[in-house]
Amino acid sequence: RFLSNICKATWPVLFFFFALSNPVFSQSLVINEIMTSNSNSIKDEDNSYQDWIELYNSGPTSVNLLGFGLSDDPLVLYKWTFPNVSLASGQYLIVWASDKNKTLVGGQLHTNFKISSTGETILLTNTSGVTISTVPPVNLQTDISYGKYPNGTGPYAYFGTPTPNAANLSAGFSEILNPPVFSQASGFLTSGFSLTLSSPDPGTTILYTLDGSEPDENNLSGTTYNYKNQYPKLPGQAFGPFLYNSFQTLQYTAPIPVADRSSQPNKLSAMSTTYDFTPPYFPNGPIYKGNIIRAKVIKPGALPSKVVSKNYFITPSGSNKYSLPVLSLS
């Protein structure tokens, strides 16, 4: 009778503990990283790039997610619910925000909604109705993620190198910068002009190049390299001399003059691309040239902007110079 009374007294306590155990341990679950405009990070099982949400379990115990809700609407916390899957301690789980609504246990999980790249609140809610992790609305550029740093515990930050299904090991950025604004669109123009660059973000610096290279804050002094245009093709032929060229990043401080560069010496068109000792395709004189201007915005503690490239061709005949469409790759 004594043991029976103990069992009767203990059973409700044990039942109460186990009933609460999963919600308690679920507090270690976080939305660790998200991407709302995916064009090049990871693909789903259908070989397509989709938005994704990464969960991370920082606790000591596996958590069963059955009945947990994911939503982009604070008024509908269980917009999409998890099937009977568990997330082990220290593990990550990718849920695709693709609107494909897949909940097959053992397969990849897909929500029944997508996430706007301009920003939506994302919520993870446990079976007790408690929202245990919330990502605030944030405007994300393509292939930029937003996640916790330090991993799993810190505030949210921007990442230029996303880490789906892995820890956020590199320090994130507190701000993401908008691309620079050019005062003139690319194209053919009949006369030169002064190009102005601007940034919509305060306290920033604009870097640009005129040689087609990527703007780089570590190349403000320029980089010189050497190359050769001649190599022996036949016995007795000598190696050609070393030639030199350079590329450099500039800091924008004043309008950039854009003019017809056709009278300047040939550079790229004068570089050999074959093993011919005397290439027959070198131009006999200066050729028609365009202006390639590439720029980006930087700021301490902020994720640099995407590089913007513009091409300008100055000629009296304007766009009528060629009868065929012109495609510029830079």
Report the location of each language-model feature:
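Bacterial N-terminal signal peptides that target proteins for export
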Residues: 1-11, 22
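Activation on beta-sandwich/Ig-like modules and their edge loops
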Residues: 25-155
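First exposed extracellular module after export/assembly in secreted or surface-exposed proteins
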Residues: 2, 45-46, 200, 284
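C-terminal segment of classical bacterial N-terminal signal peptides
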Residues: 16-25
